[in-house]
Amino acid sequence: MEPHFDVNPRANRDLDEHYLYIRRDSPEAAVRLLRAADSTFRQLARTPYLGAEFPVQRPDLAGLRIWQVEGFRNYVIYYRPIEGGIEVVRVLHAARDVPAALDEPG
């Protein structure tokens, strides 16, 4: 069975927001970000423990890990290994207040 990745709705909104922000200055870079995120999700699905553990207080986020979007070091993927792949929880800019962002409603 091919490893898979599930992108939750909040992470999809993150990607949409990043795309729209970058597109204002560089439509090509915005498309590259989405392609790089997809490629990185696939890589992480194949090797789910590649990313570093990210400590969290919330039990529902236990096992959270982080990894940069390939070629976009300021964009960080927060994900959890799941059976057969990964669940992408958030995709945040490195300057964000991560604990606050993780507490935002879905």
Question: Can you say where each PLM-predicted feature lies in the sequence?
Answer:
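Arg/Lys-rich, positively charged N-terminal/basic patches that mediate binding to nucleic acids
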Residues: 1-36
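Basic/aromatic recognition patch in beta-strand/loop cores that engages polyanionic ligands
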Residues: 49-83
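Generic structural signal for secondary-structure transition and capping sites
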Residues: 27, 42, 46-50, 72, ...
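Residue-level signal for well-ordered alpha-helical positions
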Residues: 18, 47, 101-104
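PIN-domain endoribonuclease scaffold, especially VapC-family toxins
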Residues: 31, 35-45, 64-67, 71
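Residue-level recognition of oxygen-bearing side chains
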Residues: 10, 39, 97
